[in-house]
A protein has these predicted regions:
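Alpha-helical residues within the helix-turn-helix
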Residues: 26-27, 44, 65
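Short alpha-helical "packing" element that flanks the helix-turn-helix/winged-helix DNA-binding module
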Residues: 8-15, 67
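A short LG(V/I)-centered, amphipathic sequence patch enriched
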Residues: 43-60
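Residues within the DNA-recognition helix of helix-turn-helix
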Residues: 31-34, 38-41
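Short helix-coil-helix linker/hinge
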Residues: 2-7
Length: 68
């Protein structure tokens, strides 16, 4: 497993815990854009959506709950 994949999984877990990509980014010392990009890369790698996203909320999909 590549380091970037580990970062993407850690980012996913932190976003799921906090319910926010912005807060997950702050907790990891990265930008919100980097957090979002890691999530997109992980979803692309897995071939599933892990979160339902709106401008104000983030919630796990069924696939996201299973992956967690």
């Amino acid at each position: 497993m590549a380091i970037n994949e580990l970062r993407a999984i850690a980012n996913f877990a932190k976003a799921a815990e906090l319910g926010s990509l912005r807060q997950a980014a702050a907790a990891q010392g990265i930008t919100p854009q980097a957090s979002s990009q890691l999530l997109v890369q992980l979803e692309s790698h897995l071939g599933v959506r892990l979160f339902h996203r709106t401008t104000r909320s983030l919630s796990l999909t069924e696939e996201g709950r299973q992956f967690l």
